[in-house]
Amino acid sequence: MANIKSAKKRAIQSEKARKIIASRRSMMRPFIKKGDAAIEAGDKAAAQKAFNEMQPIVDRQAAKGLIHKNKAARHKANLTAQINKLA
């Protein structure tokens, strides 16, 4: 444990930030998994709906720096390609 006041404050702030980041990440994951599940089921309409729900959330998290912008683009591109294969 830190002895210096600023180090104690920093530890508290880091823990608070860690909880917020974990919460946002866990909020994002089900939207991605919902699209994958719809593709495995072969339901194009449900997959498209899941993609439309997932896209703004992934973009928002990338804009806030939670995930890298290339990772967001990769999620969207992979899901779009899989949806197009279902046609």
Curated annotation (Swiss-Prot):
Gene3D superfamilies in the record: Ribosomal protein S20
Entry-linked InterPro entries: Ribosomal_bS20, Ribosomal_bS20_sf
Keyword Cell division included in the entry's annotation: no
One function term, GO molecular function aspect: small ribosomal subunit rRNA binding
BP terms from Gene Ontology: translation
Highest taxon of source: Bacteria
PANTHER family assigned: 30S RIBOSOMAL PROTEIN S20, SMALL RIBOSOMAL SUBUNIT PROTEIN BS20C
Name of the protein in its database record: Small ribosomal subunit protein bS20
